[in-house]
Every structure is written in C-alpha cells, then in structure tokens.
C-alpha cells in the first residue's frame, strides 16, 4: 500500500478521517514530535532548512531587482527622484478596460503599472546603483547565491556532510563566528562599500568593477591610516549646498561625525553612516575574539553563568544551571532570538522615519507610512512568537532539578506576583485612559470643549528638550546655550544635530501635546495587556492552581472534559491565541497614531491632530472616516481611478476579517452536524455521488478552528489597514 500523508507520523497517517490532513499540516514543522526523531537528527534537519530559507530570501530579492530592471523606471527616477513615481512592476490584466488602463498608466510608463512603496528605489540609489544593467547584474548574482544555498542545504542532508551534535552545541565557537563573522565582517564590508562605491557615486564619480582598484576613495590614500592621523578622513565633508549624485558642493571626507541630515535628500550623511559601520565592525570583530575555543584563552560561557550568583544569598542561585538549560533547549534559544529580533524590528520601524538613511525616502510619504506600518506589524508577530516558544520550553525542555533556586525557578515561584502586578498595571492604564477619552468625548458632544481634561506630557517634553529641542523653553542640557555639551556639539561632535532637531521639515523628536499623552497611554495599555497574557501563558504553561498537571497535556489542548470543570481555554496555546488579538489591537493604535500625526504634519496642519486626538470621536471621524472616504464612495460618475484597487482591497480585507468570526464564534458540534448533513445530501444526489472520498469528513478541532479564525482575523485586519494606509496617503501626496 502506498504510504499516506503524513510520512513523519505512522499513527496519524492511519487516521480514517480528514483530521489526518489538518493535523499533518499542523505538525509538519514540529520535528520533535515526528517518528524516529533523535536529538541529532532534529538539529541536522533545522540546520539544512536554514539554507532553504536563505535560498527563498535570495530568490525573492533577485526577483525585486529583476522586475524593476525589466519593467520599472529606475534610470528615469534616479534623474529626478522627487518628481518621478517609482514603478514596482507592470500589471498584466486581460480584464482591464480602457478606463482602467488609463488609470494605472503612470510614472512615465506605456501601460498599466504598480507604483513602488517599498523604498527599494531609494535604497539602491543610495548604495550607488544608477543603471538597469547594474540591477540585472545584482539579480543574477542573487540568483546564483540562491542556487548555492539550495545546493548547500541538500549537501548538509547527506550523511557524510551532516554536522555532529557536538558541533551544534559548541556555543563559544558559534558566538565568536556570529559576532566577528556575521556582524563584524559584514559591517566592515558595508562600510567599505559605502566608502569605495556609494560615497563617490553620491559625488558624481562612478566606481565600477573596471575602476574599483584604481580609484582612491580619499585623496590622501592610506597614508593617514598608517601614520595615525585618522582625523584627515573627516576633513572637508560635503557642504550644505551639495547636490546628491553630482560633484557640486561635494567634499572629500569619507568618515565623519556631522549629525543631522543632508539638506537636499533629508537623509543621514553617507559619511556618517560609513563611520558608524566601521565603528560597529571594530567593536564586533573584537567581541568575536572573547570566547574560549581551541586556544584555551578567553571566556567560557559556562563559567560566566556559574559564577553569576548574587552576593548575600537573598536572591537565590542566580545563573547556576542556565548553561545546560539554554544550550540543550532549541525553544529557549529561539525564544531569546525572537525576542531580540522583535525588538530590533520595532526599532527599525522607529528609526527608518526619524533618522532616514536612504536619499529622498523622507519625501516619499506613502513609502514612509508603508515601511513604518510593515515593520511594526512584523515586530508584533515576532515578539509574540518569543513568548510562545518560551512556553513550549517550560513544557518540553525545563528540568526543575537542573535549575533549583536559579532565576528561572524563582520566576516560576513568584509568578503570581508578576502576573498580578501586570494585571494591575493594565487595569490602571485601561480605566484611566478610557476615562479621560470618554470624559473628553462627553464634554465635546455637549458643546463644552474647554472642559476637556488635557494633560501636557511634561516629562517627555523635558527629555526632548535635554536632547536639544528648544520649542518647549525648558533650557536644559543641549537646549541650554550655557551648557558645555551645547558648545562642544557646535564643532566637536554632531554639529548638524541641533539644526535637525529644531527643524520642522523632518520627523525627529516630533512636537507632542495632550493628544500624544493620551494615545501614548492607550498604547501602553495595549502593550501591558498583551504582555500580561503572554507572560501568564508562559509562566502557567507547566501548571497552575486550577490545573497543576497542565504540563502533561502539552502546549495546546482544548479542555480536560467535564470531570474537571473550568479546564477549558487555559493551555499555553490559548494564551498565545488571545495575545495575538491584543497585539494586533495595539499595533493598530500605534500605526493609527503615527499615520494621523504625520498626515497632519505633511499637510502643514498639525492643529488637526492636536485638536481632534483628545477624544475618541475625533479619532473615528477625523482620522478613520475622513481618510477612508476615497475608499468607500463606491461607484461614482467619474469611473475608475488609481485608488480603485485599494478600494476593492479595503472591502475584501473586511470580508476576510469578518470570515474569521465564523470560525471564532461557533462551536464544533454545529460544524459536525452541518458536515454530516452535506455529506448525506451529497451521497444521495445523482452525478454528485459519483465523486467519493476516502477520509470521513469531520469538523476541525476546537484548537484548529481557533487557528483558522485567528489567521483570517489577522490577514483581514492587516489587508484592510494596508489598503487604507496606502490609498489615503498616496491619494493626498501621490
């Protein structure tokens, strides 16, 4: 008999119902649960799959380069980045009538095209690409890397080339290689690329493979480097009148500390960026030589952790036992990696708009909005995943004997205090913030706006002032002309910083008031509630007062039947599931805030945000309703326009989102009865009953239906907001 899906589980493949298919898909990546798995095989499978992941990434980026080179207008755009709209790719759609063809033919194209809102044009332009040929070469190179990655993945699945488990558990070697090789050398390479290729290109001098080795990036060559006169490299920077990509107003410096933005491109100085990456490279290359490997010198991570015991004895065993716990648990490692990556992704969102590093991207408002929103949503999912794997660690990998009295054990011992404090913080934030908003709504509705409770964010304003923002009149640190730091800053470090922080043409340290104070606390409510659910899910994953043996039930279970009342909805998976709704809710508030504040600033109408954001009806009416008007006016006498596709996506996103509730607010019995009725009718319908199926159709399990509901909710939520964001921004600014 032919083997049936899933091959990795003999038991599941013999299941006579459709459960076989869904459970097979659900556990396909849970390698730990597969038949015949050993620890070594587990590590080897994951290792090989990383090469597949790299191949997908290289193929995807290659496709971006290829389609822009083939169907885009990169060369025309780079002649006039502020007025030509960048084209992502052509649209081939046989259903397009003449009005649609006209509506979507833009950016100087001869037929319908999509406009690029990803920022890749600005990114490629900044790093020195100027021609379609260079884009094609990049696409080909990345295609080659994808092929190499696939070959490496296949190779590392062959018995002869599979690394041993001791290699995977060699923490010091891995850390050294990642610090020095991954971060250090790649930062050095990027700094080198900026100095040798991007900076000359920004000054109108093309550097290609033909003249790379003969063109000096700095007139003094390497002499100042070897003689220790490194400051020579920072002398004669580009002037404030420099025109990007030309020699007009350009200097010769390659490593600077100017601060602020290039006046024309409104992006960070390339010479500052090169300096930053060189410094990072030096630090990380040194850091990658800290840990003890073959030569018997350097730190042992085990020794560091074992000796981290707090003095006095009042805080337990500190980090004792953590080395083996961490080094033997992939879920622990993944949890830490996801937590770090999630924070970094959110920081990317915050820094891409406040300190834009790509030329002219700050003036492409739709791209700025899209990139901020994209990175914040990604960060939300990644951070939630960190807690999910933290919970799985506690269920599958945590050994109480190994961790007696250390920080992990102590976290579990006083989890009630942690959870109740988080709960208190969430309740406090929720009631007070909502109370203020609702009060303001009521007095607005009764025609007494002067009775609103408006609180100035004085502490945040003070922090902004200490960084040099003079608007609030605090006269402290960098905003005080009497401060030594202020004087040093004029010439010694970051002379351009104070000009930038006090300029109204960028998003650096935006002016804040009562509306910001309120929405800040609304976001804090969302963050604390999401964290509460995730932390409780992880800390209660092994057991709780209600269900002390929860660990035996695994990560996801619906209930333990009627004999133990109240054991439904308390698995670690349920906490994760609930937290995702709160996470989406929170990121929604974050992106609403960012977008509305920037729309007001970009339109030169900051008062709109300041006056309407202090009460809920202001958000609903002046942000959501006002900006979705172009998407919900349906058919009009003017016919098709370039926002029509977003209007359709806005509608379709709502549909997907609403479909989620069908799975979330109906129970299994309903579906089972419906399925049986449909199957009964099918078997008795002529012609239809010629089609048979082997598996008995059964309803999704409770956990599966929740997952399907959550997936529709999330996808619909994001699609709807993406369409709203791009249409409302591009409709105003192009």
Curated annotation (Swiss-Prot):
What is the protein's name according to its record? Photosystem I P700 chlorophyll a apoprotein A2
* Biological process (GO), any one: photosynthesis
Positions annotated to bind [4Fe-4S] cluster: 559, 568
Which reaction is catalysed here?
reduced [plastocyanin] + hnu + oxidized [2Fe-2S]-[ferredoxin] = oxidized [plastocyanin] + reduced [2Fe-2S]-[ferredoxin]
Binding, chlorophyll a B1: 654
Under the subunit heading, UniProt states: The PsaA/B heterodimer binds the P700 chlorophyll special pair and subsequent electron acceptors. PSI consists of a core antenna complex that captures photons, and an electron transfer chain that converts photonic excitation into a charge separation. The eukaryotic PSI reaction center is composed of at least 11 subunits.
From which source organism is this entry? Chaetosphaeridium globosum (Charophycean green alga)
What are the transmembrane regions? 46-69, 135-158, 175-199, 273-291, 330-353, 369-395, 417-439, 517-535, 575-596, 643-665, 707-727
Q: What does this protein do?
A: PsaA and PsaB bind P700, the primary electron donor of photosystem I (PSI), as well as the electron acceptors A0, A1 and FX. PSI is a plastocyanin-ferredoxin oxidoreductase, converting photonic excitation into a charge separation, which transfers an electron from the donor P700 chlorophyll pair to the spectroscopically characterized acceptors A0, A1, FX, FA and FB in turn. Oxidized P700 is reduced on the lumenal side of the thylakoid membrane by plastocyanin.
Q: Which GO terms describe its molecular function?
A: 4 iron, 4 sulfur cluster binding; chlorophyll binding; electron transfer activity; magnesium ion binding; oxidoreductase activity
